[in-house]
Every structure is written in C-alpha cells, then in structure tokens.
C-alpha cells in the first residue's frame, strides 16, 4: 500500500473526524482524483508539439493522457473546431497517491524560489488547483530532450464540502502551503 494512503487511513482520517466532529467515517473528506492538464497552444502551427506534450505527460503521470480538442473555431487564434490543443490525464487510486507523494516530496521542492503554494487556489467546493510553470521540476523529464518549456495545471478533487475542510486535509497530507 502507498505510504500516503496508509498515513491517510491511520492518522489523517481520525484527526479530521475529531476536528470536524463527523459522525461517520464516510463523512471524512478524501482525495477523489487528480487531473493534470497541459495546454499546448503552439500545436496549431506545429503538429509535433502535441506529441511531445503527450509523451511528457505520460512520463509524469504514469499513464497515457487524452488529447483535448478545440470545441469551437476562433479566427483570432487561427483555430478550427476539432484541432488538438492540449492533453489531460485523470489519476485515481494507487497512481493518484503515487503522483501526489512524488509531487509533495520531490517535485515541488525543485521549483526555483519555492516558498510554499498559495492558500487561495481553492474553488469554494473543496477542490484545489495548482499551476506549474515548467515541466522540468519532475524527475522523469530529461532536460536534454525537452523541446519547449511548458506549464500545466494540477487539480486535486476532494470530497470535502468546504474549502476549510479541504485545506485541512491537504495540510495533513503534507502540502506545503505558504505561512
């Protein structure tokens, strides 16, 4: 079993139960899924850009991402409906815990001038969004093979009812929030 999942079951869940006075274990918020999205705006001109983004996301997440396509045409961006414009991957279960563990303990500390992540990125429903400016912070990405530095969005979806509950859950898991 993953060490983060073990920690959740043994320490975090009972701590949250006492803090928020839940009656049942099923009320305790837990992490449902993690969605990693990488927008590839230059895929409009360069078709190979989407392939490199898909390859990088596969290395980072450990599973093959889905190519996202444009919903409508936008003339200003020279974009047609159905053109590939990004890639996303949804992690659940064991892979989700592995990725979160790697993100907290290895990748985030590698960010330049890292002082913690923002406390304000909650959406009001207990989900947290984290923007990453470069994919090079992940150990799986080989610096020499990177054609272009790309950022990505990481959304952590929880079953929490409020931002306060979700913040407490993520703090207990070990997310390095700003003081």
Swiss-Prot record:
**What is the protein's quaternary organization?**
Part of the 50S ribosomal subunit; part of the 5S rRNA/L5/L18/L25 subcomplex. Contacts the 5S rRNA and the P site tRNA. Forms a bridge to the 30S subunit in the 70S ribosome.
Q: What's in the keyword line of the UniProt record?
A: Ribonucleoprotein, Ribosomal protein, RNA-binding, rRNA-binding, tRNA-binding
UniProt KW tRNA-binding keyword = yes
One Pfam family this sequence matches: Ribosomal_L5
Family per similarity comment: Belongs to the universal ribosomal protein uL5 family.
Determine the domain of life of the protein's source: Bacteria
UniProt protein name = Large ribosomal subunit protein uL5
UniProt entry tagged with the keyword Ribonucleoprotein: yes
**Transmembrane regions:** none
Q: Which GO terms describe its molecular function?
A: rRNA binding; structural constituent of ribosome; tRNA binding
**InterPro entries xref list:** Ribosomal_uL5, Ribosomal_uL5_bac-type, Ribosomal_uL5_C, Ribosomal_uL5_CS, Ribosomal_uL5_dom_sf, Ribosomal_uL5_N
| Role, per record | This is one of the proteins that bind and probably mediate the attachment of the 5S RNA into the large ribosomal subunit, where it forms part of the central protuberance. In the 70S ribosome it contacts protein S13 of the 30S subunit (bridge B1b), connecting the 2 subunits; this bridge is implicated in subunit movement. Contacts the P site tRNA; the 5S rRNA and some of its associated proteins might help stabilize positioning of ribosome-bound tRNAs.
- What's a single GO BP term from this record? translation
């Amino acid at each position: 079993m993953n060490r983060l999942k073990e920690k959740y079951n043994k320490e975090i869940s009972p701590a949250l139960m006492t803090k928020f006075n839940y009656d049942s274990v099923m009320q305790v918020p837990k992490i449902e899924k993690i969605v990693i999205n990488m927008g590839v705006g230059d895929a409009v001109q360069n078709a190979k850009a989407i392939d490199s983004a898909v390859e990088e996301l596969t290395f980072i997440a450990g599973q093959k991402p889905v190519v996202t396509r444009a919903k409508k045409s936008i003339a200003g961006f020279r974009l047609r409906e159905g053109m590939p414009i990004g890639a996303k991957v949804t992690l659940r279960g064991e892979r989700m815990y592995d990725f979160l563990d790697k993100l907290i303990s290895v990748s985030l500390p590698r960010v330049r001038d890292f002082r913690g992540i923002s406390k304000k990125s909650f959406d009001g429903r207990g989900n947290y969004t984290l923007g990453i400016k470069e994919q090079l912070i992940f150990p799986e990405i080989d610096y020499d093979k990177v054609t272009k530095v790309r950022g990505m969005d990481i959304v952590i979806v929880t079953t929490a009812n409020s931002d306060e509950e979700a913040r407490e859950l993520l703090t207990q898991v070990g997310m390095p929030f700003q003081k």
